Structure formats: C-alpha cells, structure tokens
C-alpha cells in the first residue's frame, strides 16, 4: 500500500526524525500526494530466499576471538577482506550503524549501496559507495561462525559444521 511513514524518535539519536511540536498531523492526514516518500528495500538472496532490509544488512562474526574471511565482488572486481564483519547499507541507513563504524553519510536522494567493513584486519578502504543498480556478491568461505542481521534483527545463523560455502547476492535497491 502507499502509506506515508512518519518517523518519531524514541531514543536519543534520530536522523530524519521530527519533533512532535513540528508535526502538522492534519496536513499529513489530508495530504494524498505521497510521491516524495520512497520505499527502499535492498534484498539479499541466498539460493531461492529473498530477505529485505530498510536500513542495512550486517554480516558479523559470532565469536569475539575469531575474524571473518569475506570475499566481495562488485563491478567485476574481487576483494578479500578479513574483519569482524561487514555492513551493507542504503543511503537512508548510512546514518545508523554504517556511520558508527566509520562509514560516510550519504544524501538520501542518492540511490546507492554503502559497503563498510567492521574493524577490518586487512588493508581495505573504509567504505565503498556504489550505485544501487550494482550487483554485489558476497562469499563467506565454509566453516565460519557468523550471523546476518536485517535492520538489527538476526535472521540467519551459520552452521560451523557445514562444508557448504555460503554465497549471497545483493540485488539492486528498489526506489519506487
């Protein structure tokens, strides 16, 4: 459905959050034109499963004493990374975990994907910003213990006993 979203901060930090004093609820309820509201849904695909996230997808290690080996392919370039994890953010989500991990704040009107490592051990750019239509492939070699979180909710936990290599593909961010 085409329902507008009203952001109201409930914590101490809130980006794009209005003060309740600044909100004209009558205008919002009367306004039928919601063209300026965009839906951002990056999708991560694992085999036949599609899992959406509004702000970010985080792949993070589950053991404090281990490091993850992550292989990333974007624009036909392969990068191997050793880090505590990786954040894949939308431009709107760039002000959340991405920013806390040292990533850039990206203007929300830019249709982009931000790739930010979490405590990288290898030499890797702090962040990479790519066009939202870019295909991003992530490979996590077998027998590593990690979880995947979508907007802070854990959706997947790896099985360290499996000999399977986990391959993920991030489809383009949808802006409608």
Per-region residue spans from a language model:
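Gly/Ser/Thr-rich active-site loops/lids in small-molecule metabolic enzymes
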Residues: 80-84, 88-124
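A residue-level signal for conserved active-site and pocket-lining positions in enzyme catalytic cores
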Residues: 9, 57, 152, 168
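Proline-centered loop/turn at the N-terminus of a beta-strand
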Residues: 4-6
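Conserved small/polar residues in nucleotide/adenosyl-binding loops
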Residues: 176
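A generic structural signal for short beta-strands and their flanking turns/coil linkers
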Residues: 38-42, 53-55, 66-70, 84-86, ...
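Catalytic core of DAGKc-family lipid kinases
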Residues: 11-85
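A conserved acidic, glycine/proline-rich C-terminal tail/linker
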Residues: 135-160
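N-terminal glycine-/serine-/threonine-rich phosphate-binding loop
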Residues: 1
